[in-house]
């Protein structure tokens, strides 16, 4: 039995419910604990370690950059940063990129950019942004307000003004929420923390049409879905819908902290010197890591592999549901952003899987996320499903014993 505790880290602010597990190194899809036990990592640092642990390309890039330059500030030119920005623009709708350090920071910048867009066009009254129930956009004050979840907002004073939350997937509710102060719409193509809930292509297309009709900006939060997680570089590319603004982070650096805001020239109108900034954003180490990630992901066949592993994992998980319907009931998600709807409390399933040395992460709607590195092999998929089978069997056995007692 694994206990959630903070006793091993008495001087760390106790805001995380940490398990008593500690890891000393990682190899590909595996984490090696301090006692030598090997765990199959299907958390990927919550969709961060897209290339697994200690990927040779990332190690090489960071080792080489570490001997050259770590930090110089954004007062000077950054050739490698410009290279990364150009590559991201070439692969997307964007004309401009701003680099920062995290997903929440990227979303803060998106919110500022959406508001400033209308200010620059003579409409400072347009500052409100429509968001969706079940969303998660970060833990800063602005992104908490955009998220709108009471459990995250409690204790931090009045929520920041400027966000109108509507039911997910309800286009009529979106239409009713649009007013003279509305500046844009912010949505995750797939809600990760919210329970791996996908926005349908039809819904995203309807949002795009509304934004075009009303002069709003459409912003996609691709912090979790971006950088290959759904089987393409960006999740929205598989829907046929193009945003005006997008946030990236998590897998962009493959484990090294970096975030980004991508925007069209029109969306970024008015964003000149002094309108935004970051001390560490786009530092050379982070840029080197992100360029190395793109080097790997843009090789022919990379996303085909993700899609192939996705299909295999979904098929195997469906067969587990057939045999253990008392524990799990549904598979959802795209690419290797997979959610399993649990019948038992999701925390119990996460714990049972951890006891089988398979690491997963919970989400809303009683869902357990399977987020393997995108380099996962067929053998590792098979291995993970075997561990899930054993975890489900253990839970079923425990339920039977409780019922008999």
UniProtKB/Swiss-Prot annotation:
PROSITE patterns: AA_TRANSFER_CLASS_3 (PS00600). It comes from the Bacteria. Binds 1 pyridoxal phosphate per subunit. Pathway: Amino-acid biosynthesis; L-arginine biosynthesis; N(2)-acetyl-L-ornithine from L-glutamate: step 4/4. GO terms for molecular function: identical protein binding; N2-acetyl-L-ornithine:2-oxoglutarate 5-aminotransferase activity; pyridoxal phosphate binding. Transmembrane segments: none annotated. One of its GO terms (biological process) is L-arginine biosynthetic process. N(2)-acetyl-L-ornithine binds at residues 139, 278. It is found in: Cytoplasm. SUPFAM superfamilies: PLP-dependent transferases. Its EC number is 2.6.1.11. Pyridoxal 5'-phosphate binds at residues 103-104, 136, 221-224, 279. Its cofactor is pyridoxal 5'-phosphate. It catalyses: N(2)-acetyl-L-ornithine + 2-oxoglutarate = N-acetyl-L-glutamate 5-semialdehyde + L-glutamate. GO terms for cellular component: cytoplasm. CDD domains: OAT_like. The modification N6-(pyridoxal phosphate)lysine is found at residue 250. Pfam families: Aminotran_3 (PF00202). May also have succinyldiaminopimelate aminotransferase activity, thus carrying out the corresponding step in lysine biosynthesis. HAMAP family: ArgD_aminotrans_3. Homodimer. Belongs to the class-III pyridoxal-phosphate-dependent aminotransferase family. ArgD subfamily. PANTHER family: AMINOTRANSFERASE CLASS III, SUCCINYLORNITHINE TRANSAMINASE. This is Acetylornithine aminotransferase 1.
């Amino acid at each position: 039995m694994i206990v959630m505790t903070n006793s091993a880290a008495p001087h760390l602010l106790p805001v995380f419910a940490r398990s008593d597990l500690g890891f000393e190194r990682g190899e590909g899809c595996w984490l090696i604990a301090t006692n030598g036990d090997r765990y199959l990592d299907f958390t990927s640092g919550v969709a961060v370690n897209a290339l697994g642990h200690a990927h040779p390309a990332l190690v090489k890039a960071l080792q080489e950059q570490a001997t050259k330059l770590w930090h110089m500030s954004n007062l000077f030119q950054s050739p490698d940063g410009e290279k990364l920005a150009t590559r991201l623009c070439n692969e997307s709708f964007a004309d401009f990129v701003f680099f920062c350090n995290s997903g929440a920071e990227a979303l803060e910048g998106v919110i500022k950019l959406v508001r400033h867009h209308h200010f620059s066009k003579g409409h400072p009254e347009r500052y409100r942004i429509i968001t969706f129930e079940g969303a998660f956009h970060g833990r800063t004050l602005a992104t908490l307000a955009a998220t709108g979840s009471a459990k995250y907002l409690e204790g931090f004073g009045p929520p920041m003004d400027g966000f109108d939350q509507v039911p997910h997937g309800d286009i009529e509710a979106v239409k009713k929420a649009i007013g003279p102060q509305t500046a844009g719409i912010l949505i995750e193509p797939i809600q990760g923390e919210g329970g791996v809930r996908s926005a349908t292509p039809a819904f995203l297309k309807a949002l795009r049409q509304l934004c075009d009709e009303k002069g709003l900006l459409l912003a996609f939060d691709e912090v979790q879905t971006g950088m290959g997680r759904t089987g393409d570089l960006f999740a929205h590319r598989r829907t046929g819908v193009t945003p005006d603004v997008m946030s990236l982070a998590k897998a962009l650096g493959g484990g090294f902290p970096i975030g980004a805001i991508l925007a069209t020239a029109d969306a970024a109108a008015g964003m000149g010197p002094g309108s935004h900034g970051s001390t560490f954003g786009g530092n050379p180490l982070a840029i080197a890591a992100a360029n190395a990630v793109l080097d790997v992901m843009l090789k022919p066949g990379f996303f085909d592999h993700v899609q192939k592993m996705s299909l295999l994992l979904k098929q195997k998980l469906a067969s587990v549901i057939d045999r253990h319907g008392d524990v799990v009931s549904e598979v959802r998600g795209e690419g290797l952003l997979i959610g399993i709807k649990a019948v038992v409390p999701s925390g119990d399933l996460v714990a049972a899987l951890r006891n089988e040395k398979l690491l997963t992460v919970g989400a809303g709607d009683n869902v357990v996320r399977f987020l393997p590195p995108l380099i996962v092999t067929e053998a590792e998929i098979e291995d993970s499903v075997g561990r899930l089978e054993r975890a489900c069997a253990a839970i079923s056995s425990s339920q039977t014993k409780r019922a008999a007692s």
